[in-house]
């Protein structure tokens, strides 16, 4: 009995000591945080209204880097606070800031997206989190990360690209590059993710997906006629289309129609779960296919448009790309598809792609949410505040890139090392774009065929890409085509 009382007393004392120690640490932490100032900037009325207007104004001229540079110059700091997409937000403005943020995923910060992004993918009466979306995407794309997975998809992608040119470019005197690029990248994404080849389904789904993507940064107002309302309806229709495809694919699996010989993500996922006796809800699969497709097709189409624009404006660079691609084509037999080895030879073309991404990255960056108060560069980042890393902070910054406004693909072949975390078109850390190699693949294959088939000029010489908030061509970038004799 005495021993039991002694043990209970000891346990009580230890519990009290732990409790007081916790209170001491928490109090010191809070006091330390309170001593730190917030980053400089404006988040209160009426200043945040003018901050938002200034950001939007510069986005419309694709000069967000000036919005950031002006505040860096004004505050003399590597971060500042502002109001962005309705949130108190801290912008990190250096390569060191990018590294800090990418290195602290799930430690100090977690991924965050505007509420409209999540609402688009919700079912009625259902709520989802950013983490659920990211986890599902990684599960789906795990098949893309298998050894030699990229090489297996080169021939398929090459065939889709060739079919696209035959249908929409060959025989045309003028084309709108941006809408056709979106059609191409959507076709490629649907083929690789779900082996969708039915033209009727593809043509119905593409404008629906456009509605979905446009709503990611829209005002969170869900009334008939609003951008968000159209996106939610479009997302539901897309889910219905994909549920029907999934049911058909399950039927093929049960009838042993060689589904395990397909390389698309959906078929591989169904076969794997069937073999292991697991079942996945069709609506869950369809919802995540919509989410994946929204990420997979939009950004590559913008980069294709950017490259076509830049090559039209710089004939000497166009000629170097064409010369490289003609040399690669000479090694191929008639009708032979491109291979991974061919793609690896596209070194100058890859430099052009990289430089286009530096100057005209499709997305400005992504967001994190502070999991707790933390100190960055002597400033307090409060729990719940949003933190933004942006390509515009470093991609056009002379501290990291000489002559940053000049389109110079050779900067990626020189021996000058690029400062780590200064070139981040695909993000970094746990949330680096999982499909980046596939995006590069389809863009390079597009370049291979377009420069061998055509020379072109812009119909509107002054047309440039703008942001609202992501990059796009406001007039579609129409170009006049001057075809070459072409042998496949």
Swiss-Prot record:
Positions with a binding annotation for heme: 433
Pathway: Secondary metabolite biosynthesis; terpenoid biosynthesis
Keyword Membrane included in the entry's annotation: yes
Topology of this chain in the membrane: Single-pass membrane protein
Cellular localization per UniProt: Membrane
Keywords: Heme, Iron, Membrane, Metal-binding, Monooxygenase, Oxidoreductase, Transmembrane, Transmembrane helix
EC top class, as a word: oxidoreductase
Known function: Monooxygenase involved in the biosynthesis of limonoids triterpene natural products such as limonin, a compound with insecticidal activity responsible for the bitter taste in citrus. Catalyzes the formation of (1R,2R,3S,8R,10R,11R,15S,16S)-3-(acetyloxy)-15-(1-hydroxy-4-oxobutan-2-yl)-2,7,7,11,16-pentamethyl-5-oxo-6-oxatetracyclo[9.7.0.0(2,8).0(12,16)]octadec-12-en-10-yl acetate.
Family indicated by similarity: Belongs to the cytochrome P450 family.
Full protein name: Cytochrome P450 family 716 subfamily AD polypeptide 2
């Amino acid at each position: 009995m005495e021993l039991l009382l002694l043990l209970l007393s000891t346990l009580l004392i230890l519990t009290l000591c732990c409790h007081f120690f916790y209170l001491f640490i928490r109090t010191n932490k809070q006091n330390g945080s309170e001593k730190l100032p917030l980053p400089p900037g404006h988040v209160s009325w009426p200043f945040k209204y003018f901050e938002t207007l200034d950001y939007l104004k510069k986005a419309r001229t694709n000069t967000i880097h000036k919005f950031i540079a002006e505040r860096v110059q004004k505050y003399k700091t590597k971060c500042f606070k502002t109001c962005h997409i309705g949130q108190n937000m801290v912008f990190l403005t250096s390569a060191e800031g990018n590294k800090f943020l990418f290195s602290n995923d799930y430690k100090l910060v977690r991924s965050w997206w505007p509420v409209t992004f999540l609402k688009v993918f919700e079912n009625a009466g259902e709520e989802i989190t950013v983490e659920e979306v990211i986890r599902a995407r990684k599960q789906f794309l795990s098949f893309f990360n298998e050894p030699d997975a990229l090489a297996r998809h080169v021939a398929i992608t090459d065939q889709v690209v060739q079919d696209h040119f035959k249908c929409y470019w060959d025989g045309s005197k003028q084309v709108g590059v941006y809408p056709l690029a979106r059609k191409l990248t959507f076709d490629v994404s649907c083929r690789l993710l779900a082996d969708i080849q039915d033209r009727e389904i593809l043509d119905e789904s593409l404008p629906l997906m456009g509605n979905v993507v446009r709503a990611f940064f829209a005002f969170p107002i869900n009334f008939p006629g609003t951008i968000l309302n159209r996106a939610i309806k479009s997302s539901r229709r897309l889910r219905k289309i994909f549920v029907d495809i999934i049911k058909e694919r399950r039927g093929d699996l049960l009838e042993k129609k060689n589904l395990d010989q397909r390389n698309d993500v959906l078929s591989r996922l169904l076969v794997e779960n069937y073999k292991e006796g697991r079942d996945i809800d069709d609506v869950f699969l369809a919802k995540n296919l919509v989410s994946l497709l929204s990420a997979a097709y939009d950004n590559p189409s913008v980069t294709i448009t950017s490259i076509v624009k830049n090559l039209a404006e710089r004939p000497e660079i166009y000629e170097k790309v064409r010369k490289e691609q003609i040399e690669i084509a000479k090694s191929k037999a008639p009708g032979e598809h491109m291979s991974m080895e061919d793609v690896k030879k596209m070194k100058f073309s890859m430099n052009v792609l990289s430089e286009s991404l530096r100057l005209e990255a499709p997305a400005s960056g992504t967001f994190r949410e502070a999991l707790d108060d933390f100190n960055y560069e002597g400033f307090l980042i409060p729990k719940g505040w949003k933190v933004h890393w942006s390509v515009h902070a470093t991609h056009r910054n002379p501290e990291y890139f000489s002559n940053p406004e000049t389109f110079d693909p050779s900067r990626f072949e020189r021996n000058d090392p690029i400062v780590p975390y200064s070139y981040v078109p695909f993000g970094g850390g746990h949330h680096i774009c999982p499909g980046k190699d596939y995006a590069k693949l389809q863009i390079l294959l597009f370049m291979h065929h377009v420069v061998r088939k055509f020379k072109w000029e812009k119909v509107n010489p002054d047309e440039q890409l703008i942001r609202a908030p992501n990059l796009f061509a406001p007039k579609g970038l129409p170009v006049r085509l001057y075809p070459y004799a072409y042998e496949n």
